[in-house]
Amino acid sequence: GIPCAESCVYIPCLTSAGCSCKSKVCYRN
């Protein structure tokens, strides 16, 4: 997927933007 702007190590991903956590990085589905 396409990496989002934030990581998900300390804070959750912006699921509203269609991003999910994979390998400590948020990716767009």
Curated annotation (Swiss-Prot):
It comes from the Eukaryota. This is a cyclic peptide. Contains 3 disulfide bonds. Disulfide bonds join 4-19, 8-21, 13-26. InterPro entries: Cyclotide (IPR005535), Cyclotide_bracelet_CS (IPR012323), Cyclotide_sf (IPR036146). GO terms for biological process: defense response. Keywords: Disulfide bond, Knottin, Plant defense. Pfam families: Cyclotide. The presence of a 'disulfide through disulfide knot' structurally defines this protein as a knottin. Probably participates in a plant defense mechanism. Belongs to the cyclotide family. Bracelet subfamily. This is Cyclotide mra2. It comes from Melicytus ramiflorus (Whitey wood).
